[in-house]
Structures are given as C-alpha cells and as structure tokens.
Amino acid sequence: MIVITCLDQKNGMMFNHRRQSQDSVLREHVAKLVANVPLWMNHYSASQFDTESIPNLNIDDAFLQEATRGEYCFVEDAPLAPFEKWIERIVIFRWDCTYPADRYFDLQLGSGQWHLVGTSKFAGHSHDLITMEVY
C-alpha cells in the first residue's frame, strides 16, 4: 500500500480527536496523485472528499487491512506501525507550521528503512506553503 498523510512540522497528526488542518488544494493534489488507482480511507477522512474527484474512493474503517499492493490509503487518525511491512511508499503533505497535537506519526522515517526520494512545494488554499515529501 501507499500511505498518504498530512503532518505538521513536528509530525503531529491530530489534536483532541480532530484533524489539525485541511486544505482544498491539497485534496486536488491527492486526486491527481491517485488518478484511477483505488484510494482507501475511513469514514472520518471521507467527509472531506467526494467521489466525483476520486472515482475509486473506498471507504471502510478497516481500510488499512483492505488495501492491497499499489493502492493508496489516506491516513489521518490510525497508527501505521502495525502495517509498516506492507507499506511500499509514504507520501507526506507537510503543513508549513506546528499545531497542537496529541497523536503523532508513528513510523521512524530516519531509521534507515525509509529514504526521502522527492519533494515538491505548492501553495495551498489555507496554507501559504505545503510540502509534499515522498519516501
């Protein structure tokens, strides 16, 4: 599976059971990135996407168990460490700031297993700068 997630500058994901932020331009980038490949997510994340922009959107609260090789998973509030051996690639959309957080990204990107292979930057709708990192 290919993981897509949004993190702040300190790898924060959520605060008080809510996403830290969201951005409409980022969602457009996700739609272009996945193209016609299935994109899996849970019901919580699905509330910000629509099937018109992502025709192969699959919504299941057990999405990390359902996704197969080459399919994308948009992860906002789930631990990834139990699924790390099945993750082929990680795409992080990094906010240009730090938000309060009580849930953090639980994979160690500096452990030697993951290598940064590309970055790109773009202006979001509600963020001056969003950086896409691919591992």
Give residue spans per PLM region.
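Enzymes that bind and transform nitrogen-containing heteroaromatic metabolites
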Residues: M1-Y135
